Amino acid sequence: MARIAGVNIPTNKRVLIALQYIHGIGQKNAAEIIEKVKIPVDRRVNQLSDAEVLQIREVIDRDYLVEGDLRRETGMNIKRLMDLGCYRGLRHRRGLPVRGQRTHTNARTRKGPAKAIAGKKK
């Protein structure tokens, strides 16, 4: 099993698919990495040489923000919004949808389970 960016990559999958197991690398970025390293698209991870794995590691470290660094930067961006006190920051702070979705009836995922309210009794 190859280990790239702190993630164990599955050995029997194609390199294009296996790279997507790394947080921050999707289909487009995986294709770009393969193109930069000049690996055939149909090559599987267990067929890669150590030199090719090293090249992939170097390209990812040099050109892409992945795993812990990406998570940290995303968290810092959200924290910055909350510290500014802007509308998006307030929505994050209150645990409500940030991108303008309605909250009167929906948004249960973001708001959490429904809270019981003492209403009309029969």
Curated annotation (Swiss-Prot):
Annotated Gene3D superfamilies: 1.10.8.50, 30s ribosomal protein s13, domain 2 (4.10.910.10)
Region (Disordered): 99-122
InterPro entries: Rbsml_uS13_C (IPR027437), Ribosomal_uS13 (IPR001892), Ribosomal_uS13-like_H2TH (IPR010979), Ribosomal_uS13_bac-type (IPR019980), Ribosomal_uS13_CS (IPR018269)
GO molecular function per UniProt: rRNA binding; structural constituent of ribosome; tRNA binding
One GO CC annotation: small ribosomal subunit
Oligomeric and partner information: Part of the 30S ribosomal subunit. Forms a loose heterodimer with protein S19. Forms two bridges to the 50S subunit in the 70S ribosome.
UniProt protein name: Small ribosomal subunit protein uS13
Organism of this sequence: Rhodopseudomonas palustris (strain HaA2)
Taxonomic placement: Bacteria, Pseudomonadati, Pseudomonadota, Alphaproteobacteria, Hyphomicrobiales
Annotated gene: rpsM
